[in-house]
Amino acid sequence: MTPQPPLSAAGLPYRQGVGIMLINARGQVFVARRLDSPEAWQMPQGGIDAGEDPETAAWREMEEEIGTRNALLLGETAGWLGYDLPEELRGRLWGGRFQGQRQKWFAFRFTGQDADINLATAHPEFDAWRWVDVDTLVALIVPFKRPVYEQVVAELAGFAVPQPA
């Protein structure tokens, strides 16, 4: 079970979610471009359903967003990482019910082939994807999420190393 989200200064709660750092055998990280915002690249992420634990949510979100579960769990962030939505997005996303998100992030080793990744899922969120070096990741991300991505990289980049052939 996840803890109750705290209220923000604006009086709105934070949405509880998970994020996924999917790492290929070359030590590169998966990023995808959002359908609703072509300038926005991100790693897969999503909400935690009622009664769902964060790890289960991460596996579900991976399959829902990129069409695969071909992965091995490597680790997770020590705590929850959060961001506030910019004012101009707060009223549009999630019906204006949340100030931002608090997320538990997980590192996974991708064990499949690139052909296993399928963005044409039941509810597509992305229209393109690629593998990037971890040191270029943060620069691709929308500014309001960058501090979280910096923390994710600081905690999980140690898993982003090439694997022996």
Swiss-Prot record:
Disulphide bridges, residue numbers: none
Lineage top rank: taxon: Bacteria
UniProt keyword terms in alphabetical order: Hydrolase
The protein's Enzyme Commission number: 3.6.1.-
Cofactor(s), names only, from the UniProt record: a divalent metal cation
Residue ranges occupied by any Nudix hydrolase domain in the UniProt entry: 13-154
The UniProt record lists the keyword Hydrolase: yes
Family from the record: Belongs to the Nudix hydrolase family. RppH subfamily.
Record's function text: Accelerates the degradation of transcripts by removing pyrophosphate from the 5'-end of triphosphorylated RNA, leading to a more labile monophosphorylated state that can stimulate subsequent ribonuclease cleavage.
Name of the protein in question: RNA pyrophosphohydrolase
Source organism (scientific name): Rhodospirillum rubrum (strain ATCC 11170 / ATH 1.1.1 / DSM 467 / LMG 4362 / NCIMB 8255 / S1)
